[in-house]
């Protein structure tokens, strides 16, 4: 016998009610939104890959 759809939804609601909340996630998002850490972290290879010329035909895009 297959479980009814209502039974499966009620089980999902019960499982989420007991989970703990992480407070640190909010603080990390606030720091990233302010731009304090985003501008400081630059990939080491970013300049290397930007040195290559674009050889794609962009006429069909515009």
UniProtKB/Swiss-Prot annotation:
Tissue note: Expressed in roots, flowers, siliques, stems, leaves and seeds. In flowers, detected in petals, anthers and pistils.
Disruption-associated phenotype: No visible phenotype, except a longer hypocotyl in light-grown seedlings.
GO biological process: auxin-activated signaling pathway; epigenetic regulation of gene expression; response to auxin
Keyword Hydrolase: no
Keyword annotations from UniProtKB, A to Z: Auxin signaling pathway
Function comment: Mediates responses to the synthetic auxin 2,4-dichlorophenoxyacetic acid (2,4-D). Not involved in the response to indole-3-acetic acid (IAA). Interacts with RUB modification-related components and may regulate the cullin-ring ubiquitin E3 ligase complex (CRL) activity.
Subunit structure: Interacts with the COP9 signalosome.
Domain text: The F/D-rich region (45-62) is necessary but not sufficient for SMAP1 function.
Protein name, UniProt field: Small acidic protein 1
Organism of this sequence: Arabidopsis thaliana
Species lineage: Eukaryota, Viridiplantae, Streptophyta, Embryophyta, Tracheophyta
Gene name in the database record: SMAP1
